[in-house]
Amino acid sequence: MIYKANMSVNFTTADLWDDNEGILSCASPIFKTFGGKHSFYGEIVTLKIFEDNSFVRNMLEINGKGKVLIVDGSASLRCALVGDKLAELAITNNWEGIIVNGCIRDSFLINQMDIAIKALNTSPVKSIKRNIGEIDIPVNFSGVSFIPKQFVYSDSDGVLISKKLLV
């Protein structure tokens, strides 16, 4: 298991908002924070799935350096889309963070890892595996649009979206 480290990020969402208010979108505060890292940012990569995390695994198997995986699970609370094994895969492949419009599981273990994950809640139920979903399309939830190649910034205060890199 990969445990949390003392990592610092050179921004806060509050300061980013104050300095860039006219060009940012702010997600509604619906997410819980999981993992040992609480701040992250990167280029948006999107998935649209429903109760099937096959595409999550496929995406996390590639190099995610400088990228944040946005998983639109249609806000389903019936099963988890990310667990400790996928969190470890994300760490191994250098993903900056994951935002899940749905649930995660293994939260106790994930909270000890050097990973940043935002999700709606937890569920012990695993997802189905049918390899159904869409990759790199605009997804909308939490009152904002997550568009591939744009940028997301997240910390304990919230989630911001920008068309350009700010830090």
Description of each model-found segment:
Residues S154-V167:
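Active-site/ligand-binding-proximal alpha/beta "capping" segment
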Residues I2-P148, L165-V167:
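Feature captures the catalytic cores and cofactor-binding loops of soluble hydro-lyases/lyases
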